[in-house]
A protein has these predicted regions:
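Short, glycine/acidic-enriched loop or turn micro-motifs at the edges of active sites
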Residues: 9, 48
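N-terminal intrinsically disordered, cationic/polar leader segments
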Residues: 14-19, 37, 57-58
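Extended lipid/amphipathic-ligand handling interfaces
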Residues: 34
């Protein structure tokens, strides 16, 4: 698993497997799930990640 934060785009990427991505789905606003050719999850992308973390800390 690899985790990367890009401050320029405010995107947090969590890559579970090194596999080519076949399709992506926005499962909720700002959360993308990328799937491989076998249908399994390859990567999660959190858009506006700093806002998501900020809201989580408020809970």
């Amino acid at each position: 698993m690899k985790v990367h934060y890009d401050p320029e785009t405010d995107t947090l990427t969590i890559r579970l497997r090194e596999e080519r991505i076949k399709e992506s789905d926005e499962v909720r606003e700002g959360l993308l799930v990328d799937y491989g050719y076998d249908g399994g999850v390859v990567r999660f992308e959190v858009l506006r990640a700093s806002k998501v973390v900020e809201k989580a800390n408020e809970m």
